[in-house]
Amino acid sequence: MSFHKEDGVNSLCQKALHIVTELCFAGQVEWEKCSGIFPRDRGSQGGSSTDISVSLLAVVVSFCGLALLVVSLFVFWKLCWPCWKSKPVTSNITTLPQSISSAPTEVFETEEKKEIKENEKPAMKAIEPAIKISHTSPDIPAEVQTALKEHLIKHARVQRQITEPTSSSRHNSFRRHLPRQMQVSSVDFSMGTEPVLQRGETTTSIGRIKPELYKQKSVDSEGNQKEDVKICGKLNFTLQYDYENELLVVKIIKALDLPAKDFTGTSDPYVKMYLLPDRKKKFQTRVHRKTLNPLFDETFQFPVAYDQLSNRKLHFSVYDFDRFSRHDMIGEVILDNLFEVSDLSREATVWKDIHCATTESIDLGEIMFSLCYLPTAGRMTLTVIKCRNLKAMDITGSSDPYVKVSLMCEGRRLKKRKTTTKKNTLNPVYNEAIIFDIPPENVDQVSLSIAVMDYDRVGHNEVIGVCRTGLDAEGLGRDHWNEMLAYHRKPITHWHPLLELPGRATSFDSQGSCPSPKPPSTP
């Protein structure tokens, strides 16, 4: 019985203690009444939490202070370091001329700072200042410029490496006939005090715009050229673009006031057309007999896309037909801008002046050939590859072309070779090699004259056009020859335009005197 009573008392005590705990910690009873029951536990909990909060706050404050100190030191170093480092420049400006004789000075200028460092090495015999000036840096103060000029005048020394290849006696005349080659021996490389001053003064003007370099000088030159061109009539034609079929429709109406080419005081004119740069597609009108004001009224169509018209040129050539000789070119009309009159959506009428034909304007065709020279064997090989767009010399509108190559020396023909004849074509293909024996000592004295001939079984053969290559040639002919001499044993190929024969005596007949090339010496 006593045992059961003790268990009941203990359970009642535990329940009472549980109820008191809930009442105290739930806030339903004031804490002052409960402090006698739980004094030690609650106080220890509040003290420990307060200590943890204070220590954590101290750590955070210490870390922030350290970070602030590091940032402050970095900002101070950034702001004060350039000012402190630039102090030697102003202090050494006044003493720069006096310190030159004792130690060499190195001057550097960048986009942000200028430095003068004096090396404490013993003085050398020749003082060579190294100056590096940035084009984008601010202007140098006047004191520094004055000091630098005085220093450069006294001790500047220019070093220039001149590499001039030693020339052999074989190429003396070759170099003498090159007007484009600069004579290195005639150039004055001496540098005195005045060029140094000018160089120092011009460094400050780098980057400035010079209006005199942008003057339009082409206006006057074009006006003078237009005055020199002679007018030999007018040509009337119309232009329209067919958007559905992508065709440029050209209608040649008439020509007025053409010059007389026949003995009777008239001409037999016709017009030939190209849409440049394509020369394969061409059109030609009918020939109108004995008239200076022909009425053509013929329409032609060029297949071309509309977006390509801005890159095309319309070329008209007016010819005088001759039954027994080659046709004479009266003049030409070149329409550089097809949209000059309108957008070609409607038919536009155009009147253009016919410019008289010149030697350069006459389209006789082109020839392609290669040159190759073997100096050890003394052998030159000219390979005639092909021709294109040759002038029609026969009544049928074609030609029977062959190529004749002559080895010339001071106007005298030494040797000649020719290719086979290609029948009824204006674009012959040959691929035939012609070989001449020319020793190295005579290469500078000879040249080659290439003539495209039209074979005629009944009469005499006519010259379609000629071109020349050699040191005495002009333009592409000389450049082709020089390139052959520069690259031995390598075939050099170029297209050459054909020109009218200026005179038979100067190109194919024997004139003057020239020693024949010596045969190559056998080992």
Swiss-Prot record:
CDD domains: C2A_Synaptotagmin-1-5-6-9-10, C2B_Synaptotagmin-3-5-6-9-10. Its main location: membrane. Homodimer; disulfide-linked via the cysteine motif. Can also form heterodimers with SYT3, SYT6, SYT7 and SYT9. PANTHER family: SYNAPTOTAGMIN (PTHR10024), SYNAPTOTAGMIN-10 (PTHR10024:SF46). Belongs to the synaptotagmin family. Ca(2+) 4 binds at residues 394, 400, 454, 456. Residues 13-35 are annotated as: Cysteine motif. Ca(2+) 3 binds at residues 322, 325, 328. Binds 3 Ca(2+) ions per subunit. The ions are bound to the C2 domains. Ca(2+) 2 binds at residues 262, 320, 322, 328. One of its GO terms (biological process) is positive regulation of calcium ion-dependent exocytosis. The keyword Transmembrane helix applies. Residues 231-352, 363-496 form the C2 domain. Keywords: Calcium, Cytoplasmic vesicle, Disulfide bond, Exocytosis, Membrane, Metal-binding, Phosphoprotein, Repeat, Transmembrane, Transmembrane helix. GO terms for cellular component: exocytic vesicle; glutamatergic synapse; plasma membrane; presynapse; transport vesicle membrane. Residues 77-523 are cytoplasmic. One of its GO terms (molecular function) is phosphatidylinositol-4,5-bisphosphate binding. Pfam families: C2. It is found in: Cytoplasmic vesicle, Secretory vesicle membrane. The modification Phosphothreonine is found at residue 136. InterPro entries: C2_dom, C2_domain_sf, Synaptotagmin. It comes from the Eukaryota. The cysteine motif mediates homo- or heterodimer formation via formation of disulfide bonds. This is Synaptotagmin-10. Ca(2+) 1 binds at residues 262, 268, 320-322. Its cofactor is Ca(2+).
